[in-house]
């Protein structure tokens, strides 16, 4: 089975909404790349692109050394979200390709760390999201934005 990426998606004749690679600026810096953030928070940003023309991408930051950067980037940030449950009293069982993720970055890699800092300083940045545990965030009173 082929891994999902933009080329495979185009070949599949997928009919849903897709924001192409490099088609929007990174507007969200998200600390955490786990299932909850990608299935909930990133879903809403993806829907904002489709329904409201928000035109933004999300940069993910893995909070610990052993994260999902490689897996996410191999799929160019694309993944399939299964939506199951009830909506307006009706059973829902559908799939949506989420295309809002620009990429995933490993802060333990110097090149990725430099990219994370550049995103943090970008005028395009509108939101910072986080759902990491104490394993992923450490308070440093000596740290300041000027150090970026």
Q: PLM features: what roles do these ranges have?
A:
Residues 1-148:
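Non-transmembrane, aqueous-exposed alpha-helical and coiled segments at domain scale
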